[in-house]
C-alpha cells in the first residue's frame, strides 16, 4: 500500500539524482538514513525543512522504516546545524521515535550518498554498486516530506527551493512544478541581464548562462536552489571552457602531483578512482586502441561521482580533472 502510494504520487529523489523512490524503498535493509547534510555551500533548503517540519520528518521516517524493516534509523546532518539538530532531537523525544540524529563533521561532500554511508555505518558501497548491497537506503529530507504527502494521497506537484548568492535578501520559495525560474528571479529582485544562474550549488550545479536559457528553464522535482552570481563570476568563466581547451591544459600543465586522486572522496573510501591517470593521457584518449591500456588509464573514471573536489580544491594548477572524467565517461 505504502510503496504503491509513493509510486502513484510520482515521488523521486529530491536531492538531485531524481531516482524513483518507490524502487529504492522496495527492499529490506538494516539502515535507513535521511540525508539532511546540505552537501554544497550556499544552499538552505534542507535546513529550512528540518526547522519547519521536524515532527513530520521524524514520524515519516518511522513509517518508512516499517516498509524497509530497518532497525537503525538515522537523520544525518552537519554538527554545526545547531537549530536543526535541536528541532529534530526535540521531535524524536516528543514522539518517542526509534530514530537518532547523526552529527557529521563539516566537510565536502558530506552529503554524498556513499560518503555518508561510510561515515554513519563504516561500510563502503561497492564500486558502481547500490547502498542496499551494504544494508542501507538513503533518502534526502525533502524526499521524506514528499513521501509524507504521498501517504496522504497528495502527488508531487510543488517544490521548496532557496534563492541565494548575489541577491539582496536570500529567501525560500514554495512554487508549483513548472514555474519558470525567471518568475522566481523577478520575485527575488534580480536585475535582468546582469546575472547568470546555477541550478543547485557552486560545486555540482548546472550553469544557466544566457537570458534565453534562463527564460526556458523551469522548476522540476529535483530543483533545490537557484544560485545567482554576476555573469563574469569565476564559476561561469570556468564553465565556459571548451573540452579541447581543457584537454590542452591537462596535457601542458598537469604536474602529476596526484592531489586530485589523494583527496578524492571516493578514493578515500576505497574505490578505484585515479583522475591523475586520466589527466596524464586524456590528450591521446582516441588514439589508444589496446583495451587493457585504455582501461588502465581511463577505467577508473566510471567510479567518479563528479563532486568537483579535485578541480575546486585539490589541483594546484587550476585544471579540471572532474570535467575530464566526465568527458571520458561520455
Predicted feature locations:
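Short, glycine-/Ser/Thr-/acidic-enriched flexible segments
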Residues: 19, 38-39, 108, 168, ...
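Short, hydrophobic/aliphatic alpha-helical segments
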Residues: 1-10, 162-167, 240-244
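Ferredoxin-type iron-sulfur electron-transfer modules in oxidoreductases and energy-metabolism complexes
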Residues: 229-251, 261, 267-330
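Active-site loop ensemble at the mouth of alpha/beta enzyme cores that anchors a bound cofactor
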Residues: 108-138, 210-242
